[in-house]
Amino acid sequence: MPDIGLRLGGEVLVIDGAMGTMLQRHDIPAGQSLMQLNVTAPELVEEVHRLYALAGADCATTNSFGGSRHKLDAYGLGEQVVDLNRAAVRLARAGGAAHILADMGPTGLVMEPLGTATFDEVFEQFAEQASALAAEQPDALFIETMTDIAEARCAVLAARSVTDLPVFVTVTFGLNGRMDLSGTGPEAAAVILEAAGAAAVGMNCGLGPEQMLPLVERMALATTLPIIVQPNAGMPRLQDGVTVFPGTADEMGTYAARFVDAGASLVGSCCGSTPSFTGAIVDFAKTRPLAERREPEPGVVVAGPRGVVRVGGGAPLVRVGERINPTGKKRLAESLRAGRLDVVREYAIEQADAGADLLDVNVGAAGVDQQSVLPAAVLALSGLVDQPLVLDTTDPVALEAALRVYPGRALINSVSGESASMEAVLPLARRYGAAVVLLALDDDGIPATAGARVDVVRKVRDEAWSHGLTDRDLVADTLVLAAATQADGAGA
C-alpha cells in the first residue's frame, strides 16, 4: 500500500467512525477507561477496527483518545501510558485497515491564559504519548477534538519534537463557528496549525454534517493542506435521559460528497456513528474526484487565536500598533520592572480600539527580565485582544520563550543581515512557524543606498530559504531613509 503522504493529494481517504459508540455496546463497567480494553479485552477493540475496515475505511483511528498520562491518571493507569498506547496501534493494525492514525485527544488540562497549566506541562504530556504511539510506526499521528487552539498547537509542536511522522490535527467548533475555549475560527485555526507543522488539518465532533459544511468551505480557502472532516451523526439530543444522535448513514454519505466538493480529502465520522456510516461515506464519496483547491491569496499571513491578518500581496495597508515599548515611556518601564502587566494591557486595548491590525510587543528596558516578562505579556495579550502579535526583542532566549507560548502565528520583529541575528532568529522562526521581518542591516551597519539595502534583504532572504522558510514567511523592511538625513543615498 502506498505511503499515506503519497495518497493524500490524489484521492479521497475514508477514516473510520466512532470507537466509543461501538465499545459501549458491550457490558463495560462504569467508570472504566476505554483504553484499558487495549490490554484487558483486546479482542473487542480489534473487532471494532475490523468492522470499520470491512465497511471500507482506509484509515483506522487507534483506541488512544484518552492516552495522555494526565487522562490515564484519573483511572489509576498513568504508569501504563506507554503500554496502553502501543497496544492501541497494534490492535488497529490487526484490524486490517490500510493506514493507521495514532489518536491523541485533549489532555484535560486547561492551558494559560485560559487556565493554569503551563505550555511545558502540556507539551510533556503530548510528547510522552506521541513517543509511545510512534514507537509502533503508525502512518500518522492524529490529534483530534481540540477546543483550545493553544493546546492544539502545543500538541503539534510536541509530536513533531519526538517523531518525523506526519501530524494530522482536527479541532472542534461550536454552532457559532468558533472553538469553544479559545474562540478560534476555521481560518485562524488552519493558519496556526499549518504554521506549527501539521500535515493535514480539519474538524471533528461538536457538530453534525449540515452545520460543519460551511466551516469546511471556509477552512479550505485558508490553507493548501489536506482537509479532514469528521462530523457527528447529527446534532445530539437528550431522549429519555440518554444522549442520542439522530443522523442516518445516508445523510452522512450525502454530506460526505459535499465535503469533498468543498475541498476535503479525508472524510470520516465521529460520535454516534457506526460502520454503516463508513460504508455510506465510501458509497457516496470514495471515488469522487477531489475538488480543485484555490491557492490562498498572496502575502504573509499571521494569526492570533481570534484574528487573521494578511501582510503584502495586494492586501490593504496593515497598521502596526507600537506603543508597547518602554523606550521613552517611564510608566510602562516602571510597571515592567515591577513585574506588572496592567500598562501593557491598557496600551493594547487603546491601540486595538484605535484600529491597529497588529500589536508590536517590546518589553526591553534596563532592569526588566525579558525572558520571563515577554512570554508573560504575550500570554496576557493573547487572551485580551484579537490582533495578532509582533514579537520585538533582540534577546533570542526571550524570543523563543514567547514563541513557544503564543497560541497563534506571530510575526518576529526582526532578523537582520548580521550573522549573529540570522543564526539566532531564523531557526526559531522555522521551529515555531513564525513569520519574520527581514531588516536591511548587516554587520557593516545600514547601507547608504537603497540598492545596497535591497541586497542585504536578499541575503537574509536566501539565508531564510536555507532554513526552510519560504516567501510566505518573510516581510521585508528596507529601512527607508529620509532625504534630509541621507541626501546622497535616498534616491540611489
PLM-predicted stretches and their roles:
Residues 1-492:
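Domain-level signal for soluble alpha/beta catalytic cores
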